[in-house]
């Protein structure tokens, strides 16, 4: 049975990512002026906005008069540093990302074969879409709150601090600085959360394929050996493909998760430090925005850890699915085939971030612990 749209959860988001210069266009390999424009478009868009804006934020942090003033900018500067890593990674591996997306969507080896599999796949896609649309809209809401909250302050203040090369604390010039802040931050925010979504989706999709393998193994529970043996061979071949996809996924998501984990502890630390020195009574709008920002940051680091953990869990669960087959009724030759498969399953499936750690829930807990340790140290130093 022909499958439905296998990438339905992110189909719209893929189009948006091409329009904001994150992914290559589908027909970018053709010749012509339009193709050339498509190739330089990401740089034309992100150089004056994303990279210039991030450079101005870091300049503001470095030239701050004291540590407390720098802390007001550093929490966002480090966040955008993680974005730079994600951007450079997806641009450097743009062909690998496009190839993986195309294979997940069009390779007939991954076609769904019956109504039960289609129902399972569609439900899974809807669940992922629901989670990440909440995450995307929640993140954008935090940014919008930041843009608006400054209008409730007595003094002129920017939503997210950066170095402005002219005097902007006047009625005539304030909205120039504020407008650039809004446009650049919106692009940064959207790029950040969509790259998060793409990385998590790759892990989610491969975890779903491992679950599909488990379903097909368990469907052989009452199957005769004549039917089960060729089906087992097809399952083994599909498993080999999914293992290869896992390695390709690791290459794409490893730098992004590594940068996110490394920087998140500092981001949460400086955000908490900013809250301590800000106070709710003095700046209620910015205080609430910063609290929301911390909540989004915690979700941002939790999601890749969760989906990496899901991938590993469902890959390892295939051992139990093998025992769900009708193996006791099989011949010696088929049992030996299953035994070889069991030996193959002993090789653990793990997605690693660099060479340092496995992507999973334990690293999320460790990141939160590190953030608290850094925060306690920062408070002690600042006294």
Swiss-Prot record:
The keyword ATP-binding does not apply. One of its GO terms (biological process) is calcium ion transmembrane transport. Keywords: Cell membrane, Membrane, Olfaction, Receptor, Sensory transduction, Transducer, Transmembrane, Transmembrane helix. GO terms for molecular function: ionotropic olfactory receptor activity; ligand-gated calcium channel activity; odorant binding; olfactory receptor activity. Pfam families: 7tm_6 (PF02949). The keyword Transferase does not apply. InterPro entries: 7tm6_olfct_rcpt. The chain crosses the membrane at residues 42-62, 71-91, 131-151, 175-195, 251-271, 285-305, 359-379. Residues 63-70, 152-174, 272-284, 380-383 are extracellular. Residues 1-41, 92-130, 196-250, 306-358 are cytoplasmic. It is found in: Cell membrane. One of its GO terms (cellular component) is plasma membrane. It is a multi-pass membrane protein. The atypical heteromeric and topological design of the odorant receptors appears to be an insect-specific solution for odor recognition, making the OR/Orco complex an attractive target for the development of highly selective insect repellents to disrupt olfactory-mediated host-seeking behaviors of insect disease vectors. Odor-evoked OR currents are independent of known G-protein-coupled second messenger pathways. Odorant receptor which mediates acceptance or avoidance behavior, depending on its substrates. The odorant receptor repertoire encodes a large collection of odor stimuli that vary widely in identity, intensity, and duration. May form a complex with Orco to form odorant-sensing units, providing sensitive and prolonged odorant signaling and calcium permeability. Belongs to the insect chemoreceptor superfamily. Heteromeric odorant receptor channel (TC 1.A.69) family. Or2a subfamily. Interacts with Orco. Complexes exist early in the endomembrane system in olfactory sensory neurons (OSNs), coupling these complexes to the conserved ciliary trafficking pathway. This is Odorant receptor 94b. It comes from Drosophila melanogaster (Fruit fly).
